[in-house]
């Protein structure tokens, strides 16, 4: 029987049959949103339940603030706008949507009878939701400040200039001097957000180095009372 030997094509010769052209590489979006590139990071803004604070709502939803949040890696902005703030919030949100330049997801609500703890914990990060540690931006109410300090989330305290007394300013200045909070100003909220990033690093050595064992033993309420002059 005649054997037929098939001659193998030398390995150095290229096949003449056309090979499929490679598919072009996928291009990343020019401006990826933080939501798509990083874990959640929340800024929670609260004006409290007793007094309106329209100026803080406007400042939080301004293009400068939203831009600063995006640059700092924030993915979410949650605004508690109070019982009289819905119309203002909706109007500001319409401007945000019209501009269409923010990558931050913005939501809001008036009041929550269950309290603000879950929103502060969302800003704290970690837990079941995961995510990075964010920040709380608050009016200078002592109760709200205490809640944020207990959760150990960085807090920016913004006094309301429309109130008749200056106790909020005094409280914000005293706590900022001791490195417990950032004293924020309405017209400079983006700067306060930058300062909060630095405060975050310093607070890893909580409590502040100048607090001392005796001040630490007084607890947060005792520290607030001491700073405001309410001594036993």
Question: Model-derived features: where do they sit?
Answer:
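Hydrophobic/aromatic beta-strand patches that form the interior of the parallel beta-sheet core
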Residues: 78, 107-109, 137, 156, ...
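Donor-nucleotide binding loops and adjacent catalytic segments primarily
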Residues: 2-5, 10-16, 24-133
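A donor-sugar binding/catalytic signature common to diverse glycosyltransferases
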Residues: 120-164
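Active-site-proximal loop->helix
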Residues: 150, 160-183
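C-terminal amphipathic helix plus adjacent low-complexity
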Residues: 3-5, 29, 197-232
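Acidic/polar active-site rim loop that often engages polyanionic ligands
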Residues: 153-154, 174, 201
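Short acidic-hydrophobic, aromatic-tinged amphipathic segments that line or gate anion-handling sites
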Residues: 107-111, 180-192
